[in-house]
């Protein structure tokens, strides 16, 4: 984790140090912001490590309600960025409630199953009613996220929910049904015009950036060029031609992996992916060694969340 924090900070700094349009003339602006975010994250992480996960179980309903309130507030008074009303400004910090909702959904689903199988119900296995309950827990935040609309977060949440349902031991036909429903729902959404035009364009550009390299496919095309520039060993930190020129939009956020690809090359990118893999492996190990069902489902769900989000981000950059 320490390696990811250090490497991520350097990549963010490299992506922004030459971008006066982002930094307002202070080359270290995003470096400072990243360090503040890391400090907050480390403090919260230490607090969570020092807390028995059974307390998390007790607080799960409160966390869930708070996340739903946050999602409602962002629809009412949030800031719109890139077509999605997803951010709240709190004390000078920008907060994305949907990120907290992912955690809330995971521990909420874990609590439901644990209470049904280990609590007063004393079931031996997860039943159909339990799966429906998990889907209801996930459904409310999902609807609020779609209203923003934030399709990327919705995909991560859907994959996470699918993972928790699978880990819970739900009947296999539920997994098949959920997968089929997701595919069918996506097709219907496209055909019925539920998705915004720019969302459809982004998907088409992801599948084939060459269709519109100057329009919808521009981001993905520039990302692929940056990664291709890196070769095996990269152009060197702070030396990437695409990065220094600012050709890759949102490079300090959604396309941060392109900085690694261009400046650290195949070798550096492989190291970054390996570090992500170590974190994922540790999360899965914690899930497998948890001494109760709630802990196993919560850790497993967080592993699914982290793993799919990393896969989505790297895959989006690679095109």
Where in this protein do the model-derived segments appear?
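Hydrophobic alpha-helical transmembrane segments of multi-pass inner membrane proteins, especially
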Residues: 2-14, 20-219, 258-317
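Long extracytoplasmic/lumenal interhelical loops at the membrane interface
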Residues: 232-267, 290
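Extracytosolic (periplasmic/ER-lumenal) interhelical loops and adjacent juxtamembrane/interface segments
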Residues: 215-238, 242
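Short, small-residue-rich loop/turn micro-motifs
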Residues: 15-16, 227, 231, 318
């Amino acid at each position: 984790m320490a390696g990811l924090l250090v490497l991520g900070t350097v990549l963010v700094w490299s992506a922004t140090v030459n971008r006066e349009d982002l930094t307002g003339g202070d080359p270290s602006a995003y470096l400072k912001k990243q360090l503040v975010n890391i400090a907050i994250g480390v403090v919260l992480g230490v607090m969570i490590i020092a807390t028995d996960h059974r307390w998390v179980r007790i607080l799960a309903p409160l966390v869930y309600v708070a996340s739903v309130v946050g999602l409602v507030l962002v629809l009412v008074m949030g800031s719109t960025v890139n077509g999605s009303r997803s951010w709240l400004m709190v004390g000078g910090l920008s907060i994305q409630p949907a990120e907290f909702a992912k955690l809330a959904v995971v521990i909420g689903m874990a609590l439901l199953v644990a209470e049904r199988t280990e609590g007063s119900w004393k079931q031996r296995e997860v039943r159909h009613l339990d799966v429906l309950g998990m889907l209801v827990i996930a459904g409310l935040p999902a609807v609020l996220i779609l209203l923003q609309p934030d399709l990327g977060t919705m995909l991560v949440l859907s994959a996470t929910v699918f993972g928790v349902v699978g880990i819970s031991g739900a009947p296999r036909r539920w997994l098949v049904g959920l997968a089929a429903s997701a595919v069918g729902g996506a097709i219907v959404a496209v055909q019925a015009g539920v998705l915004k035009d720019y969302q459809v364009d982004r998907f088409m550009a992801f599948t084939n950036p060459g269709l519109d390299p100057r329009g919808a496919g521009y981001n993905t095309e520039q990302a692929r060029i940056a990664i291709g520039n890196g070769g095996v060993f990269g152009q060197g930190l702070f030396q990437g031609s695409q990065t220094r020129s600012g050709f890759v939009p949102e490079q300090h956020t959604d396309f941060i992996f392109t900085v690694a690809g261009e400046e650290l090359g195949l070798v550096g990118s492989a190291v970054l992916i390996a570090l992500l893999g170590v974190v994922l492996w540790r999360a899965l190990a914690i899930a497998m060694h948890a001494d109760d069902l709630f802990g196993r489902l919560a850790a497993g769900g967080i592993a699914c969340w982290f793993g799919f989000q990393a896969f989505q981000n790297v895959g989006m950059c690679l095109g």
